[in-house]
Swiss-Prot record:
Family membership noted in the UniProt record: Belongs to the V-ATPase E subunit family.
Topology of the protein relative to the lipid bilayer: Peripheral membrane protein
Places the protein is found: Cell membrane
InterPro entries assigned: ATPase_E_C (IPR038495), ATPase_V1_Esu (IPR002842)
UniProt organism field: Saccharolobus solfataricus (strain ATCC 35092 / DSM 1617 / JCM 11322 / P2)
One GO BP annotation of this record: proton motive force-driven plasma membrane ATP synthesis
Protein name: A-type ATP synthase subunit E
Complex and partners: Has multiple subunits with at least A(3), B(3), C, D, E, F, H, I and proteolipid K(x).
Function of the protein: Component of the A-type ATP synthase that produces ATP from ADP in the presence of a proton gradient across the membrane.
């Protein structure tokens, strides 16, 4: 073998070794590049998912807040209209006190209460419009004093002086009690319900 052949053989061998090493280096570089790429994709995918979850939570929170606000607004509106009904009913008391049933009821209450008091002094409070009617019902009973209360719309309050007890038969109190007990039914009638 001559020198040139030997040199060619050596060069070919070195060339093959370099080629193999370059191929290995290229494979390693591609592997590192793919790993880096996958890591970056994974990190950003995780961040995007976290942002999506956070945004969904914010949206759900806002949705819940709006639902509560809507319910509160509806309740305020319902309360407004229920109070309007109450005001209208309260305005009708003037018509109620003109009826025979009202006068009969007051007479029955006074008769019953006066029978129970015997010798105790009582004061009956009534609206200015009812004073004459009450005085007529009481008659000449010296244990009963009739006084007016400008705040009363109708009905009576009986104050027992010895015991300090007051029995309230005022229409406003009765209306308040009935209205409070029927508030749910009134709401159902106005806004639908059960």
């Amino acid at each position: 073998m001559d020198f040139e052949q030997l040199l060619d053989k050596s060069l070919n061998k070195v060339r093959e070794e370099i080629k193999t090493e370059l191929s290995k280096s290229l494979d390693e570089a591609i592997k590192l590049l793919n790993e880096g790429h996958n890591k970056i994709v994974q990190e950003y995918s995780q961040r995007i998912n976290e942002l999506i979850v956070k945004t969904k939570e914010e949206i759900e929170g806002e949705k819940a807040r709006l639902e509560v606000e809507n319910k509160r607004t509806l309740l305020v509106e319902k309360e407004y209209w229920i109070n309007k009904v109450y005001e209208r009913v309260l305005g009708k008391i003037g018509e109620v006190v003109k009826t025979k049933e009202y006068k009969d009821a007051i007479e029955n209450i006074i008769s019953k209460e006066i029978k129970e008091i015997r010798e105790e002094k009582v004061t009956i409070y009534c609206s200015p419009n009812d004073k004459l009617m009450i005085e007529k019902i009481v008659g000449n009973n010296k244990n009963v004093t009739v006084k007016t209360d400008e705040k009363m719309l109708g009905g009576i309050k009986i104050y027992f002086e010895r015991s300090g007890l007051t029995r309230d038969f005022s229409l406003k109190l009765i209306l308040d009690q009935v209205f409070d007990s029927m508030r749910g039914k009134i709401s159902d009638m106005l806004f639908g319900g059960k």
